[in-house]
Amino acid sequence: LFGNIIDKLREKIKKYCNKENLDKACSKL
């Protein structure tokens, strides 16, 4: 359950990073 929450947060962060195009900040994900 906890891992699923992390995955969802990671997906949201990736979508936000792609949207804002923050390559340096998001390359770690």
Swiss-Prot record:
The keyword Secreted applies. Heterodimer composed of subunit SS3 and subunit LS1 (U1-PSDTX-Pt1f), and heterodimer composed of subunit SS3 and LS2 (U1-PSDTX-Pt1d); disulfide-linked. It comes from Pseudomyrmex triplarinus. Belongs to the myrmexin family. The lineage of its organism: Eukaryota, Metazoa, Ecdysozoa, Arthropoda, Hexapoda. This is U1-pseudomyrmecitoxin-Pt1 subunit SS3. This heterodimer may have anti-inflammatory properties, since the myrmexin complex (composed of 6 SS-LS heterodimers) inhibits carrageenin-induced edema in a dose-dependent manner (after subcutaneous injection into rats). Signal peptide: none annotated. It comes from the Eukaryota. The keyword Secreted applies. Expressed by the venom gland. Its main location: secreted. GO terms for cellular component: extracellular region. Keywords: Disulfide bond, Secreted. There are 6 heterodimeric myrmexins which consist of a small subunit (SS1 or SS2 or SS3) disulfide-linked to a larger, quite structurally unrelated subunit (LS1 or LS2). It is found in: Secreted.
